[in-house]
């Protein structure tokens, strides 16, 4: 069935209360978006990320009365809101739409990320199979692509790896398929840990070949290589822990970082890491280095 979208432009101060009002009025989901092509950087811990001009989009079932629902939103908010728009959102099988547009991605001369329902373009290459129903990282985002591209250029045979913030497990699985001796996945999201292990099995790996942990239970023993594709804020906060996980002479690859955030990352790591490479794609960067 189709859905109705209610779009309201608000200030950052109004956004939390308007979001609550929309949910109280029966919205099935509410999202906050930049309404001015303005990039958003990570807020301080405990803060809500908001732009100076924020669009709230609330999703309602199609059989509601738009006039009555809008009145409910305003009543819950407690005062009159600015101009709003209603839009009809045609129902689609969104996973099918995503599948239609997801194609194999080449991340190195002999390394591909392939949808699990398609035949690999190069059967003789290393082909990592992913399923969109479980994918927290698919290789399509610049940060994931740059990490994979870097990893494909490393000799990882017999190395021990940690994929910190593993998501779909794409980086750790790639390392294992390239010959790493072992990999460990770490993530704060239990669903990501499940996705990682199911994707490992999909690629012919036993679950025990890629054990996964919440951060507080993760092994602390240093390894040969740490891969962390998260965000700049957490990377800075986790710098002491991530540095401690790398053996002396081992390698670290960091991404999820905007070009404008390069200095903060380097400042947090340069006392212990000699950065040897910075990759750039769109507005994102990937930094790799060696532990001193």
From Swiss-Prot:
Domain of life: Bacteria
Single annotated GO MF: protein-lysine N-methyltransferase activity
Residues the entry annotates as binding S-adenosyl-L-methionine: 144, 165, 187, 229
Top-level EC class as recorded in UniProt: transferase
Catalytic activity line of the entry: L-lysyl-[protein] + 3 S-adenosyl-L-methionine = N(6),N(6),N(6)-trimethyl-L-lysyl-[protein] + 3 S-adenosyl-L-homocysteine + 3 H(+)
An annotated GO BP: methylation
Pfam families according to UniProt: PrmA
Keyword Transferase: yes
Annotated SUPFAM superfamilies: S-adenosyl-L-methionine-dependent methyltransferases
Location within or outside the cell: Cytoplasm
A cellular-component GO term for this protein: cytosol
Alphabetical UniProt keywords: Cytoplasm, Methyltransferase, S-adenosyl-L-methionine, Transferase
Signal peptide feature range: none
E.C. code: 2.1.1.-
InterPro entries in UniProt: Ribosomal_L11_MeTrfase_PrmA (IPR050078), Ribosomal_PrmA_MeTrfase (IPR004498), SAM-dependent_MTases_sf (IPR029063)
Function in brief: Methylates ribosomal protein L11.
NCBIfam families: prmA
Protein family per UniProt: Belongs to the methyltransferase superfamily. PrmA family.
Name under which the protein is recorded: Ribosomal protein L11 methyltransferase
The species this protein was found in: Saccharophagus degradans (strain 2-40 / ATCC 43961 / DSM 17024)
């Amino acid at each position: 069935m189709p859905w109705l979208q209610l779009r309201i432009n608000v200030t950052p101060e109004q956004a939390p209360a308007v979001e609550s009002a929309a949910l109280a009025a029966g919205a099935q989901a509410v999202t906050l978006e930049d309404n001015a092509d303005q990039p958003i950087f990570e807020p301080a811990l405990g803060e809500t990320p908001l732009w100076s001009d924020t669009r709230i989009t609330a999703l309602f079932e199609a059989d509601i009365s738009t006039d009555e629902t809008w009145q409910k939103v305003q009543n819950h908010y407690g005062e009159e809101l600015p101009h709003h728009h209603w839009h009809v959102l045609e129902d689609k099988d969104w996973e099918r739409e995503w599948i239609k547009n997801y194609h194999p991605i080449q991340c190195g001369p002999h390394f591909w990320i392939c949808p699990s329902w398609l035949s690999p373009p190069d059967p003789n290459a290393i082909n990592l199979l992913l399923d969109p129903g479980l994918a927290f990282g698919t290789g399509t985002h610049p940060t994931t692509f740059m990490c994979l591209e870097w990893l494909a250029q490393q000799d990882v045979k017999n190395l021990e790896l940690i994929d910190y913030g593993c998501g779909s497990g794409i980086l750790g699985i790639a390392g294992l398929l390239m010959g790493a001796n072992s990999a460990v996945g770490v993530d704060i999201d239990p669903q990501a840990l499940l996705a990682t292990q199911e994707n490992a099995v999909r690629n012919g790996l036993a679950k025990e070949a890629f054990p996964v942990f919440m951060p507080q239970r993760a092994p602390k023993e240093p390894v040969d290589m740490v891969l962390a594709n998260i965000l700049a804020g957490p990377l800075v906060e986790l710098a002491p822990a991530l540095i401690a996980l790398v053996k002396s002479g081992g390698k670290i690859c960091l991404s999820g970082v905007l070009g404008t955030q390069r200095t903060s990352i380097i400042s947090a790591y340069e006392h212990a890491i000699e950065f040897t490479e910075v990759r750039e794609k769109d507005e994102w960067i990937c930094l790799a280095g060696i532990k001193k």
